[in-house]
Structures are given as structure tokens and as C-alpha cells.
A protein has these predicted regions:
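Catalytic core of soluble alpha/beta enzymes
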Residues: 42, 47-177
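Catalytic domains of carbohydrate-active enzymes, especially glycoside hydrolases
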Residues: 31-43
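Short, solvent-exposed beta-strand edge segments and adjacent coil->beta transition regions
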Residues: 9-11, 37-39, 138
Length: 178
């Protein structure tokens, strides 16, 4: 209430990094689904993208997935992004360099899967610029990265005004006092 919240429940998802094998990943995803997680985020990297997604989609044809590229690709990888369009992902998180929203806009125009910005989201002005050029359809807000709660709420409001979904990601700081 203090921050203007309108809901009492927040859905959480399960996140999986690169695993030792597809079988290990599929087992971990099954455990997350059995536990009740409504969606799963998969980290991807070169050599752990198209074939991994093919295995995941084959095993879980109806589950909600999105991928996080952690800025690991470039526009030169457009053919790979076009291949993963067929896997019916909710979105692709931070596919390109965090300081290049122009390339994100170009990628967004070239593929069917929506783009989510994460590392690029450093403050309200960047978000306004990204939305103006259609660089993304989702925004991940990390209060520690954007300058605290005031800026996080500003970014939320900017996105809400244009119908772009947001969520609050990690990087939540804490400290141990003496």
C-alpha cells in the first residue's frame, strides 16, 4: 500500500542457468512445475540456445517459458533469434548489449518474440527512450540499478501509462551490521 500496490499476491517464477545436460535441466524444470511455479526463466548462451529450447519445448509443450540472454548476442545472430521464434516463448530478456537500445528496436522489428529489457534499464529516461522506439514490450526493474524506489516507481508508471508490463527483478541489497 505504501508504494501504491494494488494486489496482495505476486507470482514468482523459477530461474535456471546453464546445466550439465539437457536431462538435468528437464528434471529441474519438472520439479519447478510440480512445486507450482507458473513460469520458468532459462538462461541461454551460445551452444545452449536452440537445441536446449527444442528439448525443453518437446518435453513441456504448454508451459510458460522465457529466456535471458544477459547481453550475450548481437544482431549478427538474427537467424538464431528467428529459429527460436517457433518455441512460443513469452519473451526474450536482454538479448543484446545493455547500452544499445537501437539494436534492440531493430531486433524487435525483425522477430515475433517480444523483447524484455533488463540490464538496459538504468533509469526513467532510458526507459522512455526505449519505449519511444519500440525497443521492448516488457521491462524488468531492479531498484538497485535504477537509483532506488523512487525511480523504480517512476519507471513502473511510465510503463503502465503505455501498457508495457513490468516486474521487479533481483539485485536486492542487504547488509549485516556489527
Amino acid at each position: 500500500k505504501l508504494l501504491g500496490g494494488t494486489t496482495r499476491e505476486v507470482q514468482a517464477g523459477a530461474d535456471f542457468g546453464i546445466q550439465d545436460s539437457f536431462d538435468m535441466l528437464l528434471g529441474n524444470i519438472q520439479t519447478a512445475i510440480d512445486t507450482g511455479f507458473p513460469r520458468v526463466k532459462l538462461k541461454v548462451a551460445r551452444e545452449w540456445d536452440v537445441e536446449m529450447l527444442r528439448a525443453v519445448r518437446s518435453a513441456f509443450p504448454n508451459e510458460k517459458f522465457h529466456i535471458d540472454c544477459n547481453s550475450g548476442y548481437t544482431l549478427d545472430d538474427l537467424d538464431m533469434f528467428k529459429k527460436i521464434d517457433k518455441f512460443n516463448l513469452e519473451f526474450i530478456e536482454q538479448p543484446l548489449a545493455n547500452d544499445d537500445i537501437i539494436d534492440h528496436a531493430e531486433l524487435a522489428r525483425s522477430i515475433g518474440t517480444p523483447i524484455c529489457l533488463d540490464e538496459s534499464v538504468t533509469g526513467p529516461r532510458v526507459v522512455e527512450q526505449a519505449l519511444k522506439i519500440d525497443a521492448c514490450k516488457f521491462v524488468n526493474i531492479k531498484p538497485g540499478r535504477v537509483g532506488g524506489l523512487t525511480n523504480a516507481v517512476r519507471i513502473h508508471d511510465i510503463c503502465q501509462d503505455v501498457g508495457v508490463p513490468v516486474w521487479v527483478g533481483g539485485m536486492l541489497e542487504s547488509a549485516v551490521g556489527s
